[in-house]
Amino acid sequence: MRQRTIVCPLIQNDGAYLLCKMADDRGVFPGQWALSGGGVESGERIEEALRREIREELGEQLLLTEITPWTFSDDIRTKTYADGRKEEIYMIYLIFDCVSANREVKINEEFQDYAWVKPEDLVHYDLNVATRKTLRLKGLL
């Protein structure tokens, strides 16, 4: 089984948290709301990977003013690729508390939507298991 280290930013701006709705046809949690993030590449430092993933998935304009390592978790997930292939992967999630100076987001093809969500509204979103676990640990659910 392949192993991947995943960096995930929990991005907050003015009391709201950024959630992204995964594309329906790919990923580990198709069609569900999640944190952004992705894999650390070989030879890449963790914070470099986090900043790269944010640029790739959320655009160049989102300005982070704080990045603080917060927690980690792990599990085994089945990833669905755009061509329909499936793969079981051991995932290690490194989660960061982040503060954004703005809300200028431009999502890539991995997502179909995004939202800045106040903590009291998080219960109204179809959150994936990993995101739900993270938000519970943070005391937001």
UniProtKB/Swiss-Prot annotation:
Superkingdom: Bacteria
Organism: Escherichia coli O139:H28 (strain E24377A / ETEC)
Residue window of motif Nudix box: 38-59
Biological function: Catalyzes the hydrolysis of nucleoside triphosphates, with a preference for pyrimidine deoxynucleoside triphosphates (dUTP, dTTP and dCTP).
Keyword Iron-sulfur: no
One Pfam family linked to the record: NUDIX
Keywords assigned by UniProt, alphabetized: Hydrolase, Magnesium
E.C. code: 3.6.1.9, 3.6.1.12, 3.6.1.-, 3.6.1.23
UniProt similarity note: Belongs to the Nudix hydrolase family. NudI subfamily.
GO molecular function: dCTP diphosphatase activity; dTTP diphosphatase activity; dUTP diphosphatase activity; magnesium ion binding
The protein's required cofactors: Mg(2+)
Gene name for this UniProt entry: nudI
Catalytic activity from the UniProt record: a ribonucleoside 5'-triphosphate + H2O = a ribonucleoside 5'-phosphate + diphosphate + H(+); a 2'-deoxyribonucleoside 5'-triphosphate + H2O = a 2'-deoxyribonucleoside 5'-phosphate + diphosphate + H(+); dUTP + H2O = dUMP + diphosphate + H(+); dTTP + H2O = dTMP + diphosphate + H(+)
Protein name: Nucleoside triphosphatase NudI
